[in-house]
Curated annotation (Swiss-Prot):
Originating organism: Pseudomonas aeruginosa (strain ATCC 15692 / DSM 22644 / CIP 104116 / JCM 14847 / LMG 12228 / 1C / PRS 101 / PAO1)
GO cellular component: cytosol
Protein's UniProt name: UPF0301 protein AlgH
Domain of life, per lineage: Bacteria
A Pfam family of this chain: DUF179
Transmembrane segments: none
Family per record: Belongs to the UPF0301 (AlgH) family.
């Protein structure tokens, strides 16, 4: 019998199935930053936290007044792990103190990217989140086999150009799926 190598889903969207019971992930779309034999890490991209960049910058530098445009830059709930830690997804090409290149995208985790965005010298498009979603080795694969998620290749246009309330249905539409027509019952043939 031929052994097949595992399929990893780095740079894919995880689309929560309608029956997802976990409140951290119900009705979410998650961008997978990393997925390998050791586990997976992703950022939920359609859950605004209610915070904006101005509020975050006020905490980082209480003595400086953030530019007014920062009040219109949303901060997202990236997931339930390390919710005090910031992650910025942006197109590749710009590098900061702590930037991980992900192909056509990059993820920066240092404060300098936030100050660059505030100053208007940072990436033109970005998604700023607090926290991340993490899976131990084999955990995501088990959830996939339980039909908890749909997957599709990530699309930066969905990530950066659509309002958050449209991202879930747009990601599902890439697969030709209308989530409102799916049943909560799952099975295997």
């Amino acid at each position: 019998m031929k052994q097949s190598s595992p399929t990893y889903l780095k740079h894919h969207f995880l689309i929560a199935m309608p029956h997802m019971a976990d409140p951290n992930f119900a009705q979410t779309v998650t961008y997978l930053v990393e997925h390998n034999e050791q586990g997976a890490m992703g950022l939920v991209i359609n859950r605004p936290s209610g915070l904006n960049l101005a509020e975050v910058l006020e905490q980082l530098k209480p003595d400086a007044l953030p530019p007014a445009r920062c009040q219109h830059i949303d901060i997202y709930n990236g997931g339930p792990v390390q919710t005090d830690r910031g992650f910025v997804l942006h197109p590749s090409g710009l590098s900061y103190q702590s930037t991980l290149e992900l192909g056509e995208l990059a993820m920066s985790t240092s404060q300098d990217v936030l100050f660059a965005i505030a100053a208007g010298t940072g990436p033109e498009k970005s998604l700023i989140s607090l926290g991340y979603a993490g899976w131990e080795a084999g955990q995501l694969e088990a959830e996939l086999s339980d039909n908890a998620w749909l997957t599709c290749p990530a699309d930066p246009a969905i990530l950066f150009d659509l309002p958050p309330e449209e991202r879930l249905s747009a990601a599902a539409a890439r697969l030709g799926v209308n989530l409102s027509l799916l049943t909560a019952q799952a099975g295997h043939a």
